[in-house]
């Protein structure tokens, strides 16, 4: 069994034979269901890009737990320099295996910076853990290559998709992404954290219809697969 817990915004905690955090923005997150100190055991932290609402508490958690941090090559170097002693794994799109976890770093259409300087490119991740395939889109607009992700790495058991608009896909675009990805389940994310990304997940669910099972999670709630 693999348990996927929504922590708020774009942060998720995945538990199986390994424990994985994705985009651990907890401190300063107005909708977060957890604090950095709540995580006692983390094997891997995946970061989609350098914006603060995704990089979040990566340094604090990685230092305390010894988790390895997976990120775009440039961002991995930035993290290693900023948080001395943290083990990073830099990638530049493509597949790898870390501690028996299969990871594919895939493109995302978004920027990546620390607010001043550009730090590599944005990405998403396809993770296969204990036979379950999870796609975290990161921050992105919909794009046709999502269809290729499904062809190469599917079937996707659960897709974690932004629906808030303004900086990412909105509900209409995310529903189109579901058509391309063909996942069994979809969890909407990156919405209602702040007014610019206000969105109605029920509207998204209606647009998706029978194409996938939309699971609307409140921060702290989980889907078991």
Curated annotation (Swiss-Prot):
Spans through the membrane? none
The record's keywords, sorted A to Z, are: Hydrolase
InterPro entries, per database record: Metallo-B-lactamas, RibonucZ/Hydroxyglut_hydro, UPF0173, UPF0173_UPF0282_UlaG_hydrolase
Write out the GO MF terms. Answer: hydrolase activity
Similarity remark? Belongs to the UPF0173 family.
Q: What is this protein called?
A: UPF0173 metal-dependent hydrolase PF1764
Record lineage: Archaea, Methanobacteriati, Methanobacteriota, Thermococci, Thermococcales
